[in-house]
Amino acid sequence: MLAYRYLGWTLVVYGLGYVLAPIEPSIDIAPGSLWLWLASAAMCMAGLRVAPWLQRQWQPAVAHATFSLRQASQRLNLLAASGLLCTLIDRYALRGVPLDFDFFAARDVLEATAPTAIGVVGALLGALACFSLGLMVARATDGERLTSLDWAHSVAIFSVYVGISMGVGSRSTLLVAIISTMFSVIWLRKAWGRPLHLRYWLVPLAVLLLVAVISAALMLERLDLMGLDPMLSIEYSGYAYTVRPSSGTLLWLTEHSDSAPLLVAGFSLLQYVYHGLFEFSLFAQEPFVEHTGGSVTFWLPLKLLNVLQLNLGTVDFESIAGWREGIFTTFLGPLYLDFGGLLPVAAFLLFLALGLPAAALHRGRLALLPYCSVLCALCVLFPVVNLLDSASGAYPLVASMIVPWLGRRRGQVQCNEPTPDRWQAP
């Protein structure tokens, strides 16, 4: 997997989209902040570009013949179902999250109570559900005959995983799961030399459109719970602080706010997508930031250690000068909070580390497809949000590292890894 290309094309499409979008900034980006962001983004691409070369120096090309897709898929579904059950027990039985689908009440309870050990285990194992459909597609692409029950199991696990997240008003889990699955489908067909017919591009576009509609509907539901008009969100939300609709667009939205509330909520998604770079500029200009040395980027390992009663502490975001809750600062904002002026160096090293497993997939390690699908989602959402800073990205990334062990078999066995004569690495 040449991950740097995904990141590069994402940045190009993001820039072109900004030029065409009917939005205008409320503030000017400071040149110094912009150059820092661009330099750091370039270093992220450089880290991904160097990773394949470095991986070749460390590990010569060898044949991997001990990974069974069928075994990995079946074990993954079992563990994912167990993890989702643990998550439900933790949230609704142990921590008292209400069952009335009130997003804000659910979030208040989760923020006021500490996760139990059952909840942490459930979050890690449940995140395997993100790859349930992707592995089923891999099995089908490899020629295995799958029953309707096989597909039903995976669809059910995938749906429950997304539904649990949407129950607290989160859209990012849905987005990560969909992007990861779409990447797996397209990548697998290219890897096996199968044609990518028009439907394989139209279906992902239709799915992304559906995700946008669902996200807009969720936003309307949240605004309704808050008793706010959608137009107020466009003009006065945290996103609107830096990005507003153009004058003509604002007039049109005002005239149609009652007849087309979904379009109004959809415009909020544009603000959601494009406000991060401007927020990064504001935050990078804050002179009194106390940098956290990695506690934000690597919050999940710290959380796991804290569950073991090591009490390493957490980041108090409310005490950080210039940090605003409820907004995003692209992928690089949390990394800047951690490392400050060393951001380009930190970005290079982080993406070098992230790119090494992706390089192994490019050389035939199909077991790493789930990991690379999350990395693809991370690259696609790079200009918007840092997935490592959220449960929707960090847990699947860690969980994906379990997959190679789930399909590992001892001895010489029939293996689903693509052999050199049919492998065409994208």
Regions found by a protein language model. Give the residues of each.
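A structural signal for hydrophobic alpha-helical transmembrane segments in multi-pass membrane proteins
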Residues: M1-A93
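Membrane-interfacial loop-to-transmembrane alpha-helix junctions, especially the N-terminal start
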Residues: L2-L11, A72-N77, E144-S154, A360-S373
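Membrane-interface helix caps and helix-loop-helix hairpins in membrane proteins
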Residues: S26-I27, G163-S172, P383-A391
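Hydrophobic core segments of transmembrane alpha-helices in multi-pass, intramembrane catalytic enzymes
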Residues: L36-M43, G126-G134, S172-S184, A347, ...
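Membrane-embedded catalytic interface detector for glycan/lipid assembly enzymes
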Residues: R56-L225, P334, V413-P426
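Transmembrane alpha-helical segments in integral membrane proteins
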Residues: A127-R145, V264-L277, L352-P357
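Small-residue-enriched transmembrane helix-hairpin modules in multi-pass membrane proteins
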Residues: V213-A347
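Hydrophobic alpha-helical segments
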Residues: V315-E318, W323-P426
